[in-house]
């Protein structure tokens, strides 16, 4: 059997390689460190954690908690390492960085079916390949991707607006409309002059996230953060993302002084983004400001806005829910490159890409988890989200169908957690060949 290529030994690549090895498929794992380091990494270890050491909140009311549980059920190497290297962090799963990456490196390099190649990959390798090169993908490989799929399908920075859960929006304070009577695809949150004045002042006073040196970027005029627009003058936002021109509030028959527009992000209409509100503000500040917007006082934020260096694909244009490229059979993407955010999400997509690469090598059809599971919801978002202005995503409850019946928020989340884990477990049990138990991958 020919070796399957895995490019990149971060969390996604490590999990992809491990999944392939568990199914008896030989792997050639490419990692350019230490021959060529990135601005963010400091070692040559696999799955090096370079930012926060947290893999997200735990528990049955947390979306990341469901993804953690699914990955444990799947026999994830990343979750195995996280559980062994965990440190006290309240309700979150945090790890000792060195112990975590050291454990993963040792487990992988000790496997007889793994070949490690310490060199930069400058072209897409022939044969079955998983690309998991992360936010700091080398320029040469990025250029190769552009030549293959078009430069408009690859982004070099992440300028994302916050996304809120539709069910948490107060629709009595909003109206549906498009500008000048066009299709009513947008939700509009109108503001009075006094509401706008307070909102503008709060934007000026809000604290910004301080990026790492390697995250810093030059602003493109089409993607200036909303707080920077506010600094340019009192009226700048009124001629930009908050302009009311062509939007008539049916309750007053007039254009409001200012308006915040929301656009549907997923086919099911569960998630809506604030149009033109890309931001680098700290998350508590984002929450405070969003709750100043009429109709969003109690909005549940499922994804905060970000502004940072990030190389990722326009997944809805290029990938299916199996993480295989639509126009390149046997080529898969995982992790940040595939359009997810977060350590856990990267590892989870690495698992699925590795699983389907293994099935390809074994002559079997691809598979995808059920939509009720967090991983299933995540990859369906990647495959079906609006490709115009596509934003990377992390685990959140807006990715999975809501549960029926009247219940409180906590009970609803617990019901979604149990339903998702049950569906994911049933899917795992139905895989043929089955995934070996984790210890069975050891030789």
From Swiss-Prot:
Subcellular location: Cytoplasm
GO MF entry, a single one: tRNA (uracil(54)-C5)-methyltransferase activity, 5,10-methylenetetrahydrofolate-dependent
Primary enzyme class: transferase
Cofactor(s), names only, from the UniProt record: FAD
GO cellular component: cytosol
Signal peptide: none
Gene3D superfamilies assigned: FAD/NAD(P)-binding domain (3.50.50.60)
Protein's name according to its UniProt entry: Methylenetetrahydrofolate--tRNA-(uracil-5-)-methyltransferase TrmFO
């Amino acid at each position: 059997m020919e070796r399957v290529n895995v490019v990149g030994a971060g969390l996604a690549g490590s999990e992809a390689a491990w999944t392939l090895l568990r199914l008896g498929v030989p792997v050639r794992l490419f990692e350019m460190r230490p021959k060529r380091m990135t601005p963010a990494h400091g070692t040559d270890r696999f799955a090096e954690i370079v930012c926060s050491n947290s893999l997200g909140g735990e528990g049955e009311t947390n979306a990341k908690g469901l993804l953690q549980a699914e990955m444990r059920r799947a026999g994830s190497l990343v979750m195995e390492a996280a559980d062994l290297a965990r440190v006290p962090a309240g309700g979150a799963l945090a790890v000792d960085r060195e112990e975590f990456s050291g454990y993963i490196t040792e487990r992988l390099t000790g496997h007889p079916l793994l070949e490690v190649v310490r060199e930069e990959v400058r072209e897409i390798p022939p044969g079955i390949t998983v690309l998991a090169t992360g936010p700091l993908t080398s320029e040469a490989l990025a250029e190769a991707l552009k030549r293959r799929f078009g430069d408009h399908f690859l982004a070099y920075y992440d300028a994302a607006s916050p996304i809120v859960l539709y069910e948490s929006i107060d629709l009595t304070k909003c109206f549906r409309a498009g500008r000048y009577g066009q299709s009513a695809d947008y939700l509009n949150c109108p503001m009075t002059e006094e509401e706008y004045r307070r909102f503008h002042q709060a934007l000026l006073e809000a604290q910004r996230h301080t990026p790492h040196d390697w995250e810093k970027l030059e602003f493109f005029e089409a993607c200036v953060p909303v707080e920077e627009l506010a600094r340019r003058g009192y009226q700048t936002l009124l001629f930009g993302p908050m302009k009311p021109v062509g939007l008539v509030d049916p309750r007053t028959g007039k254009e409001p002084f200012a308006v915040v527009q929301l656009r549907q992000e997923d086919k099911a209409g569960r998630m809506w983004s604030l149009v033109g509100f890309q931001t680098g503000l700290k998350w508590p500040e984002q929450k405070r400001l969003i709750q100043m917007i009429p109709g969003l006082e109690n909005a549940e934020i499922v994804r905060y806005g970000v502004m940072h260096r990030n190389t990722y694909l326009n997944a809805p244009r290029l990938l299916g829910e199996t993480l295989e490229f639509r126009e390149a059979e046997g080529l898969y993407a995982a992790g940040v490159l595939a359009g997810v955010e977060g350590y856990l999400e990267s590892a989870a997509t690495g698992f699925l890409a590795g699983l389907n690469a293994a099935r390809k090598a074994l002559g079997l059809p691809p598979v995808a988890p059920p939509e009720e599971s967090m991983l299933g919801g995540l990859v369906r978002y990647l495959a079906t989200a609006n490709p115009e202005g596509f934003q990377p995503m992390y685990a959140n409850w807006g990715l999975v169908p809501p549960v029926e019946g009247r219940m409180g928020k906590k009970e609803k989340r617990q019901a979604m957690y149990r339903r998702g884990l049950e569906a994911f477990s049933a899917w795992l049990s139905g895989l043929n060949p089955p995934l070996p138990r984790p210890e069975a991958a050891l030789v």
